[in-house]
Amino acid sequence: MAFVGSRIWSGFPEPRFICGKNRVSPGQMDPELFFFSGCTLRCVYCQNYHIANSEVGKTVSVERLSEIFLELQEQGANNINLVTPTHFVPQIIAALDQARKKGLNLPIVYNTSGYEKVETLRRLNGYVDVYLPDFKYLDPEHAKKYSGAEDYPEVAKAALEEMVRQTGNPVFNDAGIMTKWCNCETFVIAWVSERCERIVKYLYETYGDQIYMSLMNQYTPLDNV
C-alpha cells in the first residue's frame, strides 16, 4: 500500500502514508496502520527515522484517503490506526467525514507522540475512539535534550487530560474487545530509565484505572539515530 506524507501541493496539502498491521490491545484483531510521514518532534532515538524525517512515500488526496478507509472496512479491518497524524488533522477529518457519509463505522485510533495542542484534540472529539499517546518526559531538560521540545511535559499533560476527558473509562463490546479508551505508551531507554518510573507513578496517581499503560522496550540503535 502507499505512504501518506508531508509534501504541500497547491490549494490543499495531500497526505502520504504507509500501511501495516499492529496489535493495539489484547483481544483485538490487527488494525490497519497509517504511518504519516513527518513528525512534530525530533527524538534522537527515533525508531521510524526514515518516515519521521523525510517526505518518503506517495501522496494521496483526501478523497482517495476516504476511499481507502472504506476499502479497509470492506476487507474486514477491525479499526484504523493513524500514526503521527498531528500535522494532517484537517485532511483526516475531511476524509473521515466523506467516508462516514458512505458508511464507515470502524473505530479510529489516534497514535501520537503526545505533543499535541488541546485545541487540535478538541477538533477530533467525536472522530477518535481510541487515543494511543506516548508520554515521553516529565523533565523539561530531558525533553529538550532528546526531543528538542522543552515544553513537552506541560504540553503532554494537558493533551492527555483532554484525551481522557473525551474517551472516559474503557468501553468493551460484547466480544470483550475494547472500543473506546486511552492507552499511554512510555519508551524504555537505558540511559534515562529513571524517567519511566516517574512517568508510571504520575500516570497512576493522576488517572488510576481510567487509562491503560504500555512500557515499550523495543529500542534499537539505528543509522542516523
Where are these regions (language model features)?
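Structural preference for beta-strand elements that scaffold enzyme active sites
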Residues: N79-N81, P107-V109, V130-L132, T179-N183, ...
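Auxiliary Fe-S-binding modules of radical SAM enzymes
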Residues: M1, G168-V225
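Conserved radical SAM core fold
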Residues: A52, V89, G114-K117, F135-P153, ...
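Conserved Radical SAM active-site core
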Residues: F3-G126, V130, P140
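Anionic-ligand binding region
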Residues: K144-D174
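Non-cysteine beta-strand/loop elements that form the S-adenosyl-L-methionine
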Residues: N125-P140, Y212-Q218
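Conserved glycine-rich "GG(E/T)P / GGGxP" loop and the immediately following alpha-helix
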Residues: Q73-Q98, K145, D151, E161, ...
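Soluble or luminal CAZymes and related metallo-dependent hydrolases
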Residues: S61-R64, V155, W191-R195
